[in-house]
Each structure stands twice: as C-alpha cells, then as structure tokens.
C-alpha cells in the first residue's frame, strides 16, 4: 500500500511468495512464537547421514531414501533418541520438536515425548514438515519416540528425516519480511526485522 505524503505503508500480506512479489515487504505479527534460546541443535544425526548413529532403531526400520524408513506393513516399533540435555534440566523447559516426512504410502507416524510421563504429541499422516513446542518437566529421561503404529492401529510406511530438537522460549513478536528469490524458480518471505514485546 502506498500512502500520500511520501510515506510507505507495508500491508499485512499473507500471499504466497512469488516472482511478482520479489522486492516487496510485508508486516506480520505472531503470538507465542518459538524462539531458540541458543540455537544449539540437541539431536545427533537428525538427517541420518551417519546411518543409525545416535538412534535406537526398532525392528523393521532402516536408513534409506535419505532418512529412517519403514518399507513393509505391520511394523509396530519405533525409532528413539535420548537427549542428555533434556534429561538434566533443573526446571520446566520448552523444546521445539521438528521432523519431516518425505514419503508416506500407508498409516501415520506418532511423536511421543517423555515429559516425564510418556505423552503423545502428534499423529501425522501426510508428507510435510511438522514442529511442536513441548514443555518438559524435571524428571524426564530425555527420550522422544517416533512410532510406526497410529492410534487406530494402522502402521506407517514411509520415510522421516531432518529431525531437530531446540530449546526455545515463546514470545509475542512483530516482523518485517521481504520476498526474495532463493533458487531458479523458488521464492520465500525472508525475515529482515524482528521485534519482541
């Protein structure tokens, strides 16, 4: 939006980034936005580039297709990782659990976290990137699980990768973003300014 008297007002533009928006800016706000405390990645080998290093794999899981994969039906096990930092917290702390399903042909995948009670956080059944902020209390053993059995009993067949866990706080914030070209034919809104309040 262009205002008179020479000033420029940014619209709250929620449109998808595209070629015709390159160079334009938008303003947005967010409530309880997860903000990394240090940015230190707590997961070991989240992209499975080092095979099963850092992970415990249940029967039926294997590293293939760029991630942890279940390729046959009726697999009712999990992959899991124990994070010492989470196990050693001295007060309730929030963490962002993130993973990507790059392929799925059946069932759904469930995320569980020891908070310290064994708690289901998500049950997802489509390709995509998923992230959840979970508050973990003292007494947790630091373990989280990706289960191949859905709550309905159907079993997951597919691939999960790019697993990440970060310590976060949740803040209200406002943002100024600019649309930028990030590849031959890809465009993204890139944050330029962030203000918490």
Task: Indicate where each model-derived feature is located.
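Polar, enzyme-active/binding microenvironments
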Residues: 4-22, 29-175, 180-197
């Amino acid at each position: 939006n262009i205002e008179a008297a020479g000033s420029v007002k940014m619209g709250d533009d929620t449109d998808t980034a595209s070629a015709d928006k390159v160079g334009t800016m938008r303003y947005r706000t967010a409530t309880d936005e997860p903000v990394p405390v240090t940015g230190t990645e707590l997961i070991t080998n989240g992209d499975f580039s080092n095979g099963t290093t850092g992970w415990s794999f249940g029967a039926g899981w294997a590293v293939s297709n760029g991630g942890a994969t279940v390729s046959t039906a009726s697999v009712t096990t999990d992959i899991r990782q124990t994070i010492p930092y989470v196990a050693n917290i001295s007060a309730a702390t929030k963490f962002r659990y993130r993973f990507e399903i790059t392929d799925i042909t059946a069932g759904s995948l469930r995320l569980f976290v020891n908070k310290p009670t064994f708690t289901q956080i998500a049950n997802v059944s489509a390709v995509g990137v998923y992230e959840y902020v979970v508050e973990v209390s003292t007494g947790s053993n630091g373990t989280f699980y990706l289960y191949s059995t859905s709550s309905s009993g159907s079993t997951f067949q597919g691939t999960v990768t790019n697993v990440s866990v970060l310590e976060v706080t949740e803040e209200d914030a406002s943002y100024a973003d600019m649309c930028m070209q990030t590849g031959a034919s890809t465009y993204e809104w890139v944050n330029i300014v962030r203000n918490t309040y």
